[in-house]
């Protein structure tokens, strides 16, 4: 349980000290339970993580609405990296920290955007994107977190591969499927090409370049273009891939 919590809350920004102690005690007090029961406890922790993080993001969004430009000039210091810091003792302390984080992020955006309202809107979009990413977590994702936390206790070099990851691995090993020959990332809900792979279809076509955005994907099965805005990158990749040749 300690390994799982360390993996999902690496910066000590979601759970309080007492909450973590309770989770650990719960797992230790039920050491004689079967795998299914322990797995259920793990899922409960992950669902608590999702709900808490969503609530904190919503709190940040509400806090931003109350800020004025003059508020950004007050002097304040925060630890951006809290991995080695003690956990907060109360939820109110976590909320205060998230308010400071939102303020810091808004200042960083304003340095580039200059206009206060534009910066606020951009930050709100980022927070909405993070909320959507949370909503897009699947049971496979949660199960992978639990299993990888467990396997790392026995062998730090071993990892559990979810069905999605297994499929990717088999595709890469067999070379039976291919995509467009490009590395992708997500930027505010839009899948963007960050690098073209040498010898891949993208370079050969001459039609695709770095920083191109993918907002729709056409397939042989569907005559219409599928809108992939706000999709997970791995889902976009899955749709793009097709038989080699």
Language-model segments: what does each one mean?
Residues 127-175:
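Long, charge-dense accessory insertions within large macromolecular proteins
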Residues 3-6, 13-32, 38-58, 62-104, ...:
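PDZ/PDZ-like domain segments forming the peptide/carboxylate-binding groove
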């Amino acid at each position: 349980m300690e390994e799982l919590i360390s993996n999902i809350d690496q910066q000590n920004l979601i759970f309080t000290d007492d909450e973590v102690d309770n989770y650990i005690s719960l797992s230790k007090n039920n050491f004689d339970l079967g795998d299914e029961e322990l797995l259920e406890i793990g899922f409960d922790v992950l669902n608590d993580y999702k709900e808490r993080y969503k609530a904190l993001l919503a709190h940040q969004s509400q806090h931003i609405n109350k800020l004025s430009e003059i508020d950004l000039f007050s002097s304040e210091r925060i630890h951006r990296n809290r991995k080695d810091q003690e956990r907060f003792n109360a939820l109110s302390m976590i909320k205060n920290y998230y308010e400071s984080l939102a303020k810091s992020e808004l200042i960083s955006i304003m340095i580039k955007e200059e206009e206060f309202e534009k910066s606020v809107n951009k930050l709100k979009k980022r927070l909405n994107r993070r909320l959507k990413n949370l909503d897009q977590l699947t049971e496979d994702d949660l199960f992978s977190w639990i299993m990888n936390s467990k396997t790392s206790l026995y062998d730090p070099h071993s990892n559990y591969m979810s069905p999605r990851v297994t499929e990717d691995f088999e595709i890469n090993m067999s070379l039976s499927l291919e995509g467009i020959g490009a590395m992708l990332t997500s930027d505010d809900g839009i899948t963007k090409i960050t690098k073209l792979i040498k010898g891949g279809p993208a370079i050969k076509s001459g039609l695709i370049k770095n920083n191109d955005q993918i907002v729709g994907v056409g397939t042989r099965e569907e005559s219409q273009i599928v809108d992939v805005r706000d999709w997970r990158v791995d889902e976009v990749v899955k749709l793009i891939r097709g038989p080699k040749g």
